[in-house]
Structures are given as C-alpha cells and as structure tokens.
Amino acid sequence: MGVMSQGTSGDLWWGDYSLDKAQSWSMKTYVKQLVDLVAGRLTNYEYKTDIPLGFAESRIELFRRTPDAVRLKWSKALIKKMNGNRPTNRPEVYAEQVDWISKNPLEELVLQGVRIGDLGITAIPCEVYGLTGLKLKSASPFQLTFNISLANGASGYIPPIEQHVLGGYTTWPARTAGLEVNAEARIVEEVTRLLEQLYGKGRKIYVESNSSYSKAVFNAKPTAYWRLGEQSSSISSDSTGNGHHAIYKGGVGFHLPGFNHSNKNEAHNSRAVHFAGGRVEAIVPYAQSFTVQFWLWNGIIKTDELVNNQIADLNGLNLNLINTENYAQSKLIFKPEKIDMTGIKPRRWELVTLVVNSKGYELWINKDQQLKFKKGMLNSKKNEKMRFVFGGDSMGKVDFHGKLDEIAFFNRALTSKEIINLYNSSFH
C-alpha cells in the first residue's frame, strides 16, 4: 500500500533548501527523484505478516481567538452595508471571517495514531509547521514516525506558540488560522500520548545530538554552554550542568538548521535560534579573563539602506554587524573602541571568538585573529555577575538579523591553539 499525503508541512513541492538549485527543479525532475528514492528503499525492506497493528483516537476541544467588542462592532456594520452581497474586497472578506468566528468559538479536533509494527503514523486535522513534525518524531517511542496533516478535517494553520509573537498569515484570527495560541502545544501533547498508548512505552526526551565540535567544546570545559537547540522553551539550557541557564525573550524562531560548512550538505544535526527581535540573556559569574565563542549566520538582506545589527552585548563589550555597499560582505564592529573589520559574508556560518584578558581583547573569525587590542580591564567588580545579551542590544533598541548557535562561555582566556583546534574540530 502506498500513501501520498499532505505531510507535516504544507510545503510539498520544494526539496531541500540547502541544496544548490533545488528550487529550480522541474516538476518532472522532482517526481523522478521522489519515485527513485521510494523505489530504492522498497528493495531493502523485509516483508512480514505478523507485525502488531494498532489504532487510537481522541477528540479535544479548542477555543478560537474570538474578536473583541470593537472588532465585532466593525464587522457587523460592514456586513450590514454589504446587504447580503458577496465580499468584493479584503475588508469585506475579513468582516465575514470575524462574524463567523464569533458565532463558532469552539472547534472539536479528531486526533489519531496508527501503529504498523515499528512505524507510528499520526493524523492531525490542521496544517502544522515542520517543527511540529520534528517534535512528534523526536518524542515518539516508535523507531519511525510520520505525520499526515489535514486528516479528518481542515481546522486551519496551527503555528507553534512563539510564531504568534512573530506574526504572519498563519497567525491571523480567521477560519484559516483561528485556534487558540496554545493549540499546537495541546495537539502535540495529545498526539504524543496516543503514540505512547499504541507502543506501550513512554515518550523520548529530545536532546540535541553531539557533533565533533560540541565534543571538543565539552572537552575544553566551558563554564556555560548554550547550544540553542530547544524545540520550544523560555529557557536556554546550560549543557555543562553548571546551572547557568539563559532566558529567551521576545521574537525567536526555534530549532532551525544550525552551523555547517559550505562544503558539506546540511545534515540538520545542529540546531540554532533565528532572531527576529528577541534575545537570549544570561547572567554568569565574574571572571577577570574570559572567552565567549559562538557560531554566527549573517541574515542581513540586500538593501541600499544602512542596517545596524547588534549581535551581542557582553557585559559592555558590543559586537555589531553593518551591511556595506558590497552585499557579499558585512562590516563587523567591535566596541567600546569603534574598530571595524570586513569579512562576514551573508548566509554562511562563521565561528566568532572574543577573548578578554589582562592585556586587552582578541577577536577571532574562524581560525584567524582579526583584532588584538590593548585596553584596560572591564569595570566589573570581582563579586559581581556579568550580563550577556545575544540577539541585539541590552536596551531592546537594536536587533540582530540572523541565527546564532552553540554559545560557549569560558572563565579563562583561550589560547590561540585552543581556538584553532575548536574551529578545526567542526570539520570532522
């Protein structure tokens, strides 16, 4: 039996965005690759007739985000003017949507799980994000799991909770996307429970897999290590076990593909946070000498306007990124002294390392030292904590456009050999 279904995400056509020219494939090329992939897999399967089968279903009620009194009054007045005619413009269309939601404040969702041996199949009557599918796959007790969207209904787009801060058409309260803000979390929880019921074992807890780079970081014994691989959370966990957890604030996109090198296909092993007005903030113990290292993905778009991005505020030391006339590079600016360097290319990962010691500052990009600046020590007192803000400035006025991954804090100055070795470890 073969199934061609609406998968987890509605983006059925495009292939892997990380592959060159993937979006220029013809329909014929795309279909041939899909058929070849499936046919190749079928030849390796062992066919059995004695596998366990199972089915589970539950129904949950979710609220819709009903309009307030002002919006409802506007809607009714406009519908009255329409005098029974069909809408002819966007306001009239939305007026009908507002009226319908106000009259239908609840929605019942049919959620299902199917077991075919070691395969788990989930069915959701909504169109959900790819992240929702990744949550289900990583939590599922089954060896293999896939999801079918728009099954048994069409209850609209269901974005993860954090997407409601970012906005977009999937968050507009209409028939197409009107369920409560917590809908995705409730759906994931209930469908995961069905998978547990079918398999007879509890869910798995997602932990970001280790790479050669992350293993090298752990071996270097950081004081704090925020890998930024969370699927959804207000906390960025400190992976060292030292308890220096950071806090997510504002607009961020979780669990995006993390750092990789341009000469490698994206394996999606590392996961990162995409910043859209939000921040990651951490309070760490004071250190007279310290090092902060992280992977940076410059997301500045091509524009004639000056775009000032603040990557981080590290206890008063600021790293900014500004676009230049040459779109192929952006200018990296280090403060308190305004020293600028070029060489940060858009849409690629760079390893940034800032070293602070009694002699001054060092700034490294990948395995090359870009700056060695003699300066007096920071003003922090020994008993004070240090505040690190990533994704923008500490005042909430200047944002960062791009992704960060694998932030490590060391309460000592890394040597040049250690920095180079950490960078080289990422290629293994």
For the regions a protein language model found, what residue spans apply to each?
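Non-catalytic substrate/cofactor recognition surfaces at enzyme active-site rims
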Residues: M1-Y213
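Extracellular/periplasmic catalytic domains that process cell-envelope and extracellular macromolecules
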Residues: V114-R115, P141, A216-K221, N265-A267, ...
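Extracytoplasmic low-complexity segments
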Residues: V207-G278, N309, N315, K374, ...
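Extracellular, beta-strand-rich glycan-interacting domains
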Residues: A224-S232, A267, F290-I300, L351, ...
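Extracellular glycan-interaction surfaces
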Residues: I247-G277, V292-K302, G316-L378, S394
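Structural motif
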Residues: R279, G360-E362, K403, A413
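Beta-strand acidic-aromatic groove motif in beta-rich domains, primarily in extracellular
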Residues: I301-Q310
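Extracellular glycan-interaction patches encoded by glycine-rich segments
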Residues: F373, N383-D405
